[in-house]
C-alpha cells in the first residue's frame, strides 16, 4: 500500500470514528429526559398568585404540564396539598422551616409535627433550604448547622423520608481561606442522613460550575432545582442583592438544561423541579420553562 493511500485511509477512519462518537454524544444528549415524567414546580415561583387564588394557580400549574409540585412548607399547606392531589399532581417534596431544623426559639413548627404530617402525606423528601445569618459565617458555625441537619436527617430516616439541603449562593463564599461554606457542608453532611437538592442557578451565580458540582456530588443529590441565569451575570454571594432580571426562564439563560438533566441522571438524582424566584409574569414563566424542557430531545 502506498504511504499516501495509507495516510488517507487512516485519516478517514479517524474522522469517521470521531464523528461517530460525536453523533452518539449528541443523540444521548437529545434523548427525552426521564425527569419530564415527574417534573415538578417549586411553588415559591407562584407564591403571590397562590395567595390571590390558590385553586386557579394550581390549575394553571397542572395545565402547563407539571406532574407534581414542591411545597414551601409542611405545616400550613394542607389546602395546597389537597388541591394539588385533586388536580392529579403528585406532592413528594416540601421545604421545612430552617429555624426549626436549627432549633431556634420562636414560633416555628416542631420537627416532630413536621415529620408526622409529612409521613401521613407520604412525602418522600423534606428540604432544609436555608441557613440564616449568624449560623453560616465561619467553619465552626457551618459545622454546627450540618450537625443539626444530620440529627434531623436521622428523624426523617426513621419515618422513611429523605432529607436534603438546598443551596443558595452564600454557601460558595469562602469562610476560611479558600474553603467555602459548601466545602464544609460536603464534608460534614452525612450522606445517609442528608443529601443535596442542588439549585443550578445559585451554584453558578456563586461561582461554581453546576455540571462540575453535580459530578462532585455523585451519589449525593436527591433532587435538582432548574432555573436559568442571565448571560453575563456577575458572581453574587448575597441572594438579596441579585438583580431580578438575573432570573431567566429555562432555555433563555446561560445554563445548558439538557446537560444538567443528563448529568443529574448520571449522578443518581431522583427528580427535578423548576423554580424561578423572580419574574414579571410567574404563570407565563413557569409555562415557558416547562415547554422548553419538554421540547428538549424532541
Regions found by a protein language model. Name each.
Residues 158-254:
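Acidic/histidine-rich catalytic cores of soluble enzymes
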Amino acid at each position: 500500500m502506498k504511504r499516501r493511500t495509507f495516510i488517507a485511509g487512516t485519516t478517514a477512519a479517524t474522522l469517521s470514528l470521531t464523528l461517530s462518537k460525536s453523533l452518539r454524544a449528541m443523540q444521548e444528549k437529545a434523548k427525552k429526559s426521564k425527569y419530564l415524567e415527574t417534573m415538578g414546580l417549586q411553588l415559591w415561583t407562584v407564591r403571590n398568585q397562590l395567595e390571590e387564588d390558590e385553586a386557579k394557580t394550581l390549575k394553571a400549574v397542572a395545565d402547563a404540564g407539571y406532574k407534581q409540585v414542591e411545597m414551601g412548607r409542611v405545616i400550613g399547606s394542607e389546602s395546597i396539598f389537597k388541591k394539588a392531589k385533586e388536580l392529579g399532581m403528585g406532592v413528594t417534596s416540601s421545604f421545612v422551616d430552617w429555624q426549626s431544623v436549627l432549633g431556634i426559639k420562636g414560633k416555628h413548627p416542631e420537627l416532630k409535627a413536621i415529620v408526622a404530617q409529612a409521613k401521613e402525606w407520604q412525602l418522600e423528601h423534606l428540604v432544609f433550604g436555608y441557613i440564616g445569618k449568624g449560623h453560616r459565617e465561619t467553619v465552626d458555625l457551618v459545622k454546627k448547622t450540618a450537625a443539626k441537619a444530620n440529627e434531623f436527617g436521622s428523624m426523617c430516616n426513621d419515618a422513611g423520608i429523605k432529607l436534603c439541603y438546598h443551596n443558595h449562593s452564600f454557601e460558595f463564599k469562602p469562610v476560611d481561606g479558600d474553603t467555602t461554606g459548601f466545602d464544609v457542608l460536603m464534608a460534614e453532611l452525612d450522606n445517609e442522613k442528608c443529601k443535596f437538592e442542588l439549585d443550578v442557578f445559585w451554584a453558578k451565580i456563586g461561582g461554581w460550575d453546576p455540571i462540575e458540582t453535580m459530578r462532585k456530588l455523585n451519589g449525593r443529590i436527591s433532587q435538582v432545582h432548574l432555573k436559568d441565569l442571565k448571560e453575563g451575570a456577575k458572581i453574587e454571594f448575597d441572594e438579596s442583592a441579585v438583580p431580578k432580571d438575573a432570573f431567566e426562564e429555562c432555555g433563555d439563560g446561560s445554563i445548558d438544561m439538557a446537560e444538567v438533566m443528563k448529568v443529574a441522571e448520571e449522578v443518581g438524582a431522583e427528580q427535578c423541579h423548576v423554580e424561578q424566584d423572580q419574574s414579571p409574569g410567574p404563570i407565563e414563566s413557569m409555562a415557558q420553562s416547562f415547554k422548553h424542557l419538554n421540547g428538549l430531545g424532541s
